[in-house]
């Protein structure tokens, strides 16, 4: 035993003697870097309205955000500004009617440095997206898109910025399911790989180039928060738990405000459309190449606190003038708001969903109509800003309501994607599969959740995915069974092509009709006055079945 201990002592001494000398700890040289981030902006060029009565306020909009960002940069010039996908796509008419060019031009003026891609960046396909990339004065980065050659140019996995004497690597990551959330041809031959593996590969490459701070722009979000433990879940949390070596991870995609630390990594997601933005402070020791601390503050960019940036106002003015001739036409009157908030249209029946699906079903005389919750992008009336200030509108600068005047721009804000309605038949068996997909993500929110008309159904979220639908009933009271009986259905062409996981419908059936926005626009003109359904919860009900 003594012999073994003596040998061990010699071995230990030898290892100590052979170990490489540790670099001396130098006197700290701290610098604070600032990162600004907006999530899921969707070309929201105009401010949004929040609250009511004495608590009402407006926030966001390109000209307002631009001033806030300038103030932040004046306070700390060592600043980078980001967005983590869906900066365009699903946008209000002021951007969408001009191919999203106004949004990218505004982001240039707002001083954006880098962005990644979300699914909505691909809404128009590759050629329009390439045009926007070429218009951008900032960098688009995504490390988990492959086969870019021949599809998209000027897209790199990451970009290294030197800020405050520190090399900061900004790595982009696209949500893996993005291909199924847009038209099947929108990505060309581009494939999406695992974000964790791609993030590690990009980080190591950037590190080899001398980067010391690592930021991930991910189009990944928090999908739910446990009511009891308050523990979050979702792709952003999964990524944060598995990615290594990142100092800040920005999330996106789900319109959830979240900020926490995972070990030494700060993880942040904002509310969408500029309702809030993240202001991250990261202190880095330049002598010892270590992050000393990081923190985040959510900023609500209220319109009353600043004067809008005149450069952005001027940039948007010609687009507004062109748009007014098409979309300022008054269609009718809404007796109250048709709200869109808190992802409710992705969780249950909402008045806006009833309005749209009822209009589509009435237009084509089908028994059933469905629309993905993710199709509905704005309340009604919307943030669209007609030039006529005598109209009754929710925001400042107009006559007050309710009732509210509804214009064509509102409808195109609610339904900006240019989807055509398709009419077809489905069997009872197919309809059950459709509804199972609709409720598959619950209790988390998902754009696949369907708003419906012409029927009702009950589901039990405690049951396994694929076995949650309990019963389906026509408005006539007749039950729909899981059998070969057929029913007529109207739905968006995106859904009929298998988007959002509706592969059971991608069988080549269906007759293409008019644009969904045109159908709803005509319905409001015909009705004259529209009222939110006061009996929500009758079409879609959660139940518990023993």
Summary of predicted features, one role per range:
Residues 1-7:
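Bacterial N-terminal signal peptides that target proteins for export
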Residues 11:
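N-terminal glycine-rich, Lys/His-bearing helix-loop that initiates the first secondary-structure elements
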Residues 14-17:
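C-terminal motif of bacterial Sec signal peptides marking the signal peptidase cleavage site
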Residues 19-307, 311, 347-359, 440-442, ...:
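Acidic, metal/ion-coordinating pockets
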Residues 26-38, 44-68, 181, 186-196, ...:
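Catalytic centers of hydrolytic enzymes
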């Amino acid at each position: 035993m003594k012999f073994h201990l003596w040998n061990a002592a010699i071995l230990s001494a030898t290892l100590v003697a052979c170990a490489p000398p540790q670099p001396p700890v130098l006197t700290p040289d701290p610098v604070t870097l600032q990162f600004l981030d907006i999530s899921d902006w969707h070309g929201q060029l105009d401010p949004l309205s929040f609250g009511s009565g004495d608590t009402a306020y407006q926030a966001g909009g390109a000209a307002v955000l631009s001033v806030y960002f300038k103030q932040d940069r004046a306070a700390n010039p060592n600043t980078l500004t980001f967005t983590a996908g869906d900066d365009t796509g699903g946008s209000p008419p002021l951007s969408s009617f001009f191919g999203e060019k106004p949004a990218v031009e505004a982001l240039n003026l707002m001083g954006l440095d880098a962005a990644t891609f979300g699914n909505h960046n691909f809404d128009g396909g590759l050629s329009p997206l390439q045009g926007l990339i070429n218009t951008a004065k900032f960098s688009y980065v995504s490390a988990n898109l492959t086969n870019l050659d021949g599809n998209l140019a000027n897209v790199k996995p990451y970009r290294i910025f030197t800020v405050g004497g520190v090399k900061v690597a900004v790595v982009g990551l696209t949500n893996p399911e993005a291909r199924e959330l847009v038209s099947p041809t929108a990505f060309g031959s581009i494939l999406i790989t695992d974000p964790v593996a791609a993030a590690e590969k990009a980080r190591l490459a950037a590190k080899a180039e001398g980067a010391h701070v690592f930021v991930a722009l991910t189009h990944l979000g928090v999908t739910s928060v446990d009511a009891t433990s308050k523990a979050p879940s979702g792709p952003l949390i999964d990524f944060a738990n598995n990615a290594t070596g990142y100092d800040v991870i920005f999330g996106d995609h789900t319109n959830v405000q979240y900020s926490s630390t995972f070990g030494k990594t700060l993880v942040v997601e904002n509310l969408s459309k500029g309702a809030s933005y993240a202001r991250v402070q990261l202190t880095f020791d330049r002598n010892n190449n270590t992050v000393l601390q990081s923190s985040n503050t959510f900023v609500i960019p209220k319109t009353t606190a600043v004067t809008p940036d005149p450069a952005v106002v001027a940039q948007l003015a010609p687009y507004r003038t062109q748009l007014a001739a098409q979309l300022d036409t008054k269609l009718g009157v809404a007796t109250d708001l048709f709200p869109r908030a808190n992802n409710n249209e992705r969780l249950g029946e909402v008045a806006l969903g009833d309005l749209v699906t009822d209009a589509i079903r009435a237009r084509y005389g089908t028994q059933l109509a469905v629309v993905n919750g993710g199709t509905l992008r704005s309340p009604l009336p919307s943030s669209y800003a007609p030039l006529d200030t005598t109209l009754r509108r929710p925001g400042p600068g107009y006559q007050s309501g309710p009732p509210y005047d509804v214009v064509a721009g509102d409808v195109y804000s609610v339904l900006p994607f240019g989807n055509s309605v398709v009419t077809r038949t489905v069997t009872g068996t197919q309809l059950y599969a459709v509804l199972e997909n609709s409720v598959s993500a619950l209790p988390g929110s998902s754009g696949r959740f369907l708003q419906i008309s012409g029927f009702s159904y009950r589901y039990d979220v405690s049951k396994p995915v694929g076995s949650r639908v309990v019963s389906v009933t026509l408005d006539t009271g007749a039950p729909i069974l899981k059998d070969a009986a057929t029913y007529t259905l109207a739905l968006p062409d995106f859904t009929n092509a298998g988007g959002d996981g509706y592969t059971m419908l991608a069988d080549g059936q269906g007759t293409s009709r008019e644009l969904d926005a045109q159908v709803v626009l005509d319905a409001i003109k015909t009705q004259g006055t529209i009222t939110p359904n006061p009996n929500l919860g009758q079409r879609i009900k959660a139940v518990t079945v023993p």
